[in-house]
């Protein structure tokens, strides 16, 4: 039997990958974190001339995706950047193809692996659905240990549990 592995076209990883990656102007950055934290991350990235959407909720729904699409389709972002955990990356995975834009995924935690897969988890009518489409694959993933520095032990434990949950929740 033949097997196929699909991975992002570009994977920048390592210490300071975040700062050494070049980001397009007029990018839409989608995140779940408050501005005090996202501002620090965006400064580390060196990104300039961007739009920010920080209203993504944990375990997002298709309604969250539609809010991003309706709010930004006329602003014509050059690219969508999912910065954060699986929630922000999953919103970008679904929204970017709808807007006919490329996507850059930057995980700030570990556990979901969302930056590397063709899977997207969203709620439809209150029920979580695991979707798999090639269009959900990132055009670029940026993985930097910067986000692990100072991560509280409880967050690390939660991320390990999340990795286990992600491995099993797709089975209905």
How does the language model describe each region?
Residues 1-79:
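ATP/NTP phosphate-donor binding region
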């Amino acid at each position: 039997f033949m097997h196929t592995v699909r991975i992002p076209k570009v994977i920048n990883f390592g210490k300071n990958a975040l700062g050494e990656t070049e980001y397009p102007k007029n990018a839409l950055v989608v995140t779940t974190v408050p501005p005090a934290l996202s501002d620090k991350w965006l400064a580390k990235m060196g990104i300039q001339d961007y739009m920010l959407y920080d209203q993504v909720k944990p375990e997002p729904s298709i309604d969250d995706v539609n809010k991003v699409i309706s709010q930004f389709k006329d602003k014509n972002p050059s690219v969508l950047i999912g910065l954060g955990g699986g929630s922000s990356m999953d919103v970008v995975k679904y929204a970017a193809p709808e807007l006919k834009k490329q996507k850059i995924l930057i995980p700030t935690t570990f556990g979901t692996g969302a930056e590397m897969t063709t899977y997207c988890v969203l709620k439809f009518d209150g029920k979580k659905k695991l979707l798999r489409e090639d269009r959900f694959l990132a055009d670029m993933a940026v993985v930097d240990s910067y986000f692990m520095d100072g991560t509280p032990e409880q967050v690390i434990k939660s991320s390990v549990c999340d990795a286990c949950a992600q491995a099993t929740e797709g089975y209905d």
